[in-house]
Amino acid sequence: MLMYKKIVGHKKNMLPATLNNIDDSQNVALNRKKSENKKLTLQEKIELSWQFLYDLTEIILNKFSKEDVVQVNKCGQILFENGVRYEHVVDLITPHQVRSHTQLVEQEQSKGKKALRM
């Protein structure tokens, strides 16, 4: 009950905005500038997507506990040993392409298992 009172007590009365009191001209100008910028080249997309992955890795390594990092590394090693591979895809693809790629990977894995049995 005490937490409820604290939460409710800190809320400020918020009234809905009317069209007369909104000045969004700065936001509109910024959004127009963004859309006028050139589209990213494939090389820029690749660099940005890899940078995102590197940043994410740094966050995991720096913010999680040592035990969590060890556990993630163990899971990754087990996946790697069982044939799971990472494929970095920059552009969006259609669900059909995802299904066909998944089917190809499954077929390759089943061929590998059959070869091991012989």
UniProtKB/Swiss-Prot annotation:
Domain of life per record: Bacteria
A UniProt-annotated Pfam family: DUF2660
Protein name: Uncharacterized protein RP222
Source species of the chain: Rickettsia prowazekii (strain Madrid E)
